[in-house]
Amino acid sequence: MAFSGSQAPYLSPAVPFSGTIQGGLQDGLQITVNGTVLSSSGTRFAVNFQTGFSGNDIAFHFNPRFEDGGYVVCNTRQNGSWGPEERKTHMPFQKGMPFDLCFLVQSSDFKVMVNGILFVQYFHRVPFHRVDTISVNGSVQLSYISFQNPRTVPVQPAFSTVPFSQPVCFPPRPRGRRQKPPGVWPANPAPITQTVIHTVQSAPGQMFSTPAIPPMMYPHPAYPMPFITTILGGLYPSKSILLSGTVLPSAQRFHINLCSGNHIAFHLNPRFDENAVVRNTQIDNSWGSEERSLPRKMPFVRGQSFSVWILCEAHCLKVAVDGQHLFEYYHRLRNLPTINRLEVGGDIQLTHVQT
């Protein structure tokens, strides 16, 4: 079964988690699990690619264990019986630290990348097309699980061009509470063609239906600032925009603007010098009234990474930071399709944009 696009991600799902892989595993599918290893007494976590929800048939069991110096077990379970373990004694995960774990399905094997470095290759013991479920359990907190089909991209993913155990050309992973969602890893730092994926999300672990116009992902290693791009089709209810990056250690301010012609329909402006997140609209070069109230403390921290989700609804924009709902901003410019430009500037390193 061919993919026409990519499955929407699961956002901040509770652990233990089991979710459907729409259409099952396909050659070329990339699945990314992004989260943080808990600092608790737990010593293991696992990511399973399995048939159904029983756990009796697991095509690929990826199981980091913080025991005996740390190691990772890979295995397959058929009809409730485990096969011989394959162990890798290097432990790429750290307790209390975020991680970015990507699985690439290929005809002969799974290739696994951890924090931008190709970590292990696991040859199929059972036909991978039987797999229709992903499950995660153990001592982790999840930020998201995302899906991407590189067949929609006219370039090869870096897994197929980078020698085994060699790092991909991505900037060093910044330490912080959340990490950037990955795109297709380029084999060199040059920009590559954008790819189409679906990413709209409602409640944690749940997904909206596919939007009328699929979102665009711009998988650059890093972005020049300020950054400006077109929002294909403009805004509409269920449209989702995702940005990730790292706040500079000496940051004063940065902004994310959604623009309509010469107007700024939505101005999101974290200000570290004021310990505030300011929201506003500018029409004909005149600013409206600021909105500053927040349900909790300032979510952005100097020197730490962040993710911002902006979800357009009929009457407002809903904004979440690091997977947690932060505020709603009611539309002041109501002709949503004309809001078709994204501008980002200020004291951040921008690492991922999806519109």
Swiss-Prot record:
A beta-D-galactoside 2 binds at residues 267, 271, 281, 287-293. Peripheral blood leukocytes and lymphatic tissues. Expressed in lung, liver, breast and kidney with higher levels in tumor endothelial cells than normal endothelium (at protein level). Expressed in trophoblast cells in decidua and placenta in pregnancy (at protein level). Isoform 2 is the most abundant isoform expressed in endothelial cells. Upon endothelial cell activation isoform 2 expression decreases while expression of isoform 3 and isoform 5 increases. Isoform 4 decreases in pathological pregnancy. It is found in: Cytoplasm; Nucleus; Secreted. Pfam families: Gal-bind_lectin. Its main location: cytoplasm. This is Galectin-9. SUPFAM superfamilies: Concanavalin A-like lectins/glucanases (SSF49899). The lineage of its organism: Eukaryota, Metazoa, Chordata, Craniata, Vertebrata. Monomer. Induction: By toll-like receptor ligands zymosan (TLR2 ligand), polyinosinic:polycytidylic acid (poly I:C) (TLR3 ligand) and lipopolysaccharides (LPS) (TLR4 ligand) and by pro-inflammatory cytokines IFNG, TNFA, IL1A and IL1B in mesenchymal stromal cells. By IFNG in macrophages. Up-regulated in dendritic cells following infection with dengue virus. Up-regulated in Kupffer cells following infection with hepatitis C virus. Up-regulated in plasma following infection with HIV-1. It comes from Homo sapiens.
